[in-house]
Amino acid sequence: MRMPCRLALALLLCFAGPACFAASGPVRVLSVDGAIGPASADYLVRGIERAAEDGAQLVVLELDTPGGLDASMRRIVKAILASQVPVAGFVAPSGARAASAGTYILYACHIAAMAPGTNLGAATPVRLGTPDKPAEKPPARDAGPMARKQVNDAAAYIRGLAQLRGRNAEWAERAVREAVSLAAHEAAAQKVIDLQ
């Protein structure tokens, strides 16, 4: 699905300003529709690198994900943080979500945007289920040391991303510790995202 022209223009103007019109480059759109794993991490990392090689002005990550693997999410976050090209995260189309790992990725982006009718959050680390063992629920406050370590690490990680990008760090930590979620209009009002 194509990004609405109004949003594309707003994102471009946020980063390029007047210099954009002197030497404009392409806007690269990379889409993820599904779980975050090694394949999606490879796709996004390579796409961000190629955008820089091609002289892109902006990379737009169009996200619709229920979350995924921690290691893959962290690879993507590192690529965004190291990117020479501004990266805008856009949760779209309407009805999409950036849950769990998607929330961290959106927080890492230079600019975060959501289409109306989308949501983000529920970023508590959970162990993935197997056919003989269902996925676990978010760890309780009285969980064992390993679960507490995972939650504390995840909370510090997303808080750091929020502080880096000037976004709502308190809500980010709640998304990890309490598995809370927000709709797009609430996320904009609470300064979790930059544009809706």
Report each predicted region and the residues it spans.
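Bacterial N-terminal signal peptides that target proteins for export
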Residues: 1-9
